[in-house]
């Protein structure tokens, strides 16, 4: 039965999940510019276009044939790489989290004083979410699915371990230096940072309509960014 075959993408991710080095995704435009037999390039192009499709229309509304047309591939090729529409959707979710964690790992937080490291982490999270609206929208879609597809992922928890480990180290250094207060949970700190940065994007349109403020204006965004940083730092500070 075709559904029993392990998709190419799943095999590759299972083989590489423990690897610290992952090539950055190539832009879809690059994937279209040169027709090659490079699976990495082909999958990167499919994932980029599929992210927009799923973010715009959700899992039920997204069309594989539209993704195939936009990437100049075929439905058959997409199914070969990802197994099914649901498999592609899960791959897009995993890839979105993986890319965020990859960039996050380059922040060199361990080289900064604890409070500076915390500020940098909050700033990064805010900036990432503000410039990756499709990521926010697909996470919203998955929550509307009650996390059903992420629950099927074999790698999602491991992908996010480094994020919590970084906060654990940062927090431990802050405790040792006497600048952070005791009794805080690193996962809770992570949740607070994520929630504040996430809301700024997920609710920007409804918030703007209700309060008649353009939250996307550079000045408004800079003010909100500074406010969120201060909220988190003051919460953790001793």
Language model: regions and residue ranges:
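All-alpha amphipathic helical-bundle segments outside canonical DNA-binding/catalytic cores
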Residues: 116, 152-159, 176-192
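C-terminal peripheral helix-coil segments that are non-catalytic and often amphipathic
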Residues: 1-30, 124-127, 131, 161-177, ...
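Amphipathic alpha-helical interaction segments
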Residues: 45, 116, 120, 124, ...
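Amphipathic alpha-helical segments used for helix-helix packing
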Residues: 117, 131-154, 204-211
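Generic hydrophobic, amphipathic alpha-helix propensity
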Residues: 42-50, 67, 92-96, 100, ...
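Amphipathic alpha-helical linker/stalk segments
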Residues: 92-121, 151, 158
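Helix-turn-helix
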Residues: 45, 53-87, 91-92
